[in-house]
């Protein structure tokens, strides 16, 4: 079993350049319209993704929203994804947010292009699960965390072999955050463990833990 802690040193060493259903127009998306959450709520879905493009999610200041994707048939499944139904923004505002991916795949995928932005203006943002990738962004996508984020990928019980990557930014995609706290744990079958891959992408953080 391999463990990784994402620190400024690790960043320098690891740089690689190379149960709720909502009606909607796309059956592969759980939430495809604006939503307000006044109380603590957990949404578990086996869709292709839970939150699709063109959506604003507002969480009450004292509330916590958990979004869990447990799709076991699609290794491309995600929790949040821009570009799945065209170029359009996604925004999260308000209280506490937890995004969890159970199974292979990715927690956040941003590939909507230059006209898409993924913005987190939440009190706290936690990304966790057994996915092989935390954030995967390309095609000039913009991902912004106003108050930072924590990423914890724990694949210690996984039996599928993958290349585990915390953050991958390619094709002029950029990620901006006040801080990033990242921990990666690979399973025995996984072939590699990398904190961040920059393939013509940009990563900017005021603080790394």
Sequence positions of predicted segments:
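Gram-negative bacterial Sec-dependent N-terminal signal peptides
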Residues: 1-22
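Surface-exposed loop/turn motifs in large extracellular/passenger domains
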Residues: 26-27, 32-38, 45-68, 73-209
């Amino acid at each position: 079993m391999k463990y990784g802690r994402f620190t400024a040193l690790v960043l320098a060493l690891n740089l690689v350049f190379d149960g709720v259903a909502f009606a909607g127009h796309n059956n592969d998306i759980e939430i495809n319209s604006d939503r307000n959450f006044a109380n603590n709520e957990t949404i578990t879905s086996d869709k292709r993704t839970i939150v699709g493009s063109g959506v604003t999610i507002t969480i009450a200041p004292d509330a916590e929203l958990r979004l869990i994707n447990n799709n076991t048939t699609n290794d491309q499944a995600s929790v949040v994804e821009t570009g799945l139904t065209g170029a359009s923004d996604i925004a999260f505002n308000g209280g506490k947010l937890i995004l969890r991916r159970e199974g292979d795949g990715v927690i956040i995928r941003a590939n909507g292009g230059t006209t898409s932005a993924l913005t987190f203006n939440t009190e706290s943002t936690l990304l966790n699960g057994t996915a092989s990738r935390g954030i995967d962004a390309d095609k000039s996508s913009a991902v912004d965390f106003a108050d930072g984020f924590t990423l914890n990928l724990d694949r210690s019980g996984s039996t599928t072999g993958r290349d585990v990557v915390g953050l991958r930014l390619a094709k002029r995609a950029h990620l901006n955050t006040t801080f990033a706290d990242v921990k990666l744990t690979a399973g025995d079958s996984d072939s590699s463990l990398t904190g961040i891959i920059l393939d013509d992408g940009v990563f900017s953080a005021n603080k790394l833990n």
